[in-house]
């Protein structure tokens, strides 16, 4: 396949965004596309995640960009910041620009449906990465994501290990509008329920609250739960930002010595928190592989090649043992 990368780099404008608390993240946003230049490439791959303030989605975007450029495509990246209407408007703009393909992480697995249908009608293929679109009447050409149910099972096993034989009371910080996060909680509960059938020390989920996948809401929901449940023993958060927000609330309440936190993602700051003893463990995802593989599906689609409609990448459990050997960490 002839490469056109040497002819034209993708035109990128970047916005630096912070995610709640003291976390800082870098991410490309509102990537410009020059019509004249686009004609010299194979086309435009457009990416709209849930947010770019979460480094996880930024890493996916970085690898989408790299793989797209490698294969001769321009890249257009925008940031809806968890706003479903904004994301729908962005998809409408992609349609107006007649992009080659849309890569989507739905802000809401159902509400984004009409915008996806509009792209379908315009003949623009839509692919999802990380989280699926569950709306009726939409056509998604391919999906690449973590095996989130399996990752949730790993989180459940880590929780059993963290609490030991005595069991304990658990808060779940969820994000129900994201299908991937629903699967994580389902996998977690499956393992916990199976454990409770056999174990003398039960693990009881006493509260499920929206953590919104960010530090701010993770902190607020945890603070509320700590007031309502003075005997709380542990927290399972569906991603690292909400887990780190939970830790801040736990520390403010001076209960960090007792309460164990299980996160999810394996972002750099999450891994560092595991090494520092703030988070017990993370099932980690591989956003680099997601970004690369979703573009490979787009390339195959454009070439008329066959491919599996769904690719699930297994999560792996990351504990302090791994963190202590991780050269990326301090």
Where are these regions (language model features)?
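A residue-level marker of the well-folded mature domains of exported/periplasmic proteins
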Residues: 17-330
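Positively charged n-region of N-terminal signal peptides that target proteins for export
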Residues: 1-4
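Bacterial N-terminal signal peptides
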Residues: 8-16
């Amino acid at each position: 396949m002839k490469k056109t990368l040497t002819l034209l780099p993708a035109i990128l404008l970047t916005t630096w965004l912070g995610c709640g608390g003291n976390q800082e993240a870098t991410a490309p946003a509102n990537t410009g596309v020059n019509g004249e230049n686009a004609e010299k490439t194979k086309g435009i791959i457009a990416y709209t995640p849930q947010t770019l303030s979460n480094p996880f989605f930024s890493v996916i975007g970085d690898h989408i960009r790299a793989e797209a450029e490698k294969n001769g495509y321009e890249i257009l990246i925008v940031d809806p910041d968890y706003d479903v209407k904004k994301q729908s408007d962005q998809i409408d703009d992609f349609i107006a620009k007649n992009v080659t393909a849309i890569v989507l992480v739905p802000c809401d697995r159902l509400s984004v449906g009409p915008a996806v249908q509009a792209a379908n009608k315009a003949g623009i293929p839509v692919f999802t990465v990380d989280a699926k679109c569950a709306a009726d009447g939409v056509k998604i050409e391919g999906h690449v994501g973590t095996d989130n149910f399996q990752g949730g099972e790993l989180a459940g096993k880590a929780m059993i290990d963290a609490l030991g034989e005595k069991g304990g009371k658990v808060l779940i910080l969820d994000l129900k509008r994201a299908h991937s996060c629903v699967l994580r909680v389902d996998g977690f509960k499956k393992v916990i329920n199976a454990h409770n059938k056999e174990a003398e020390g039960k693990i009881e989920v006493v509260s499920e609250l929206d953590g919104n996948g960010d530090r701010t809401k993770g902190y607020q929901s945890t603070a509320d739960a700590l007031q309502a449940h003075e005997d709380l023993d542990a927290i399972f958060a569906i991603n690292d930002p909400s887990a780190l927000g939970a830790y801040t609330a736990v520390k403010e309440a001076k209960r960090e010595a007792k309460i164990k936190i299980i996160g999810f993602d394996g972002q750099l700051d999450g891994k560092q928190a595991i090494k520092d003893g703030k988070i017990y463990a993370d099932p980690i995802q591989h956003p680099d592989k997601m970004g690369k593989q979703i573009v490979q599906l787009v390339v195959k689609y454009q070439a008329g090649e066959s491919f599996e409609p769904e690719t699930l990448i297994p999560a792996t459990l990351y504990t302090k043992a791994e963190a202590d050997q991780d050269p990326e960490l301090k």
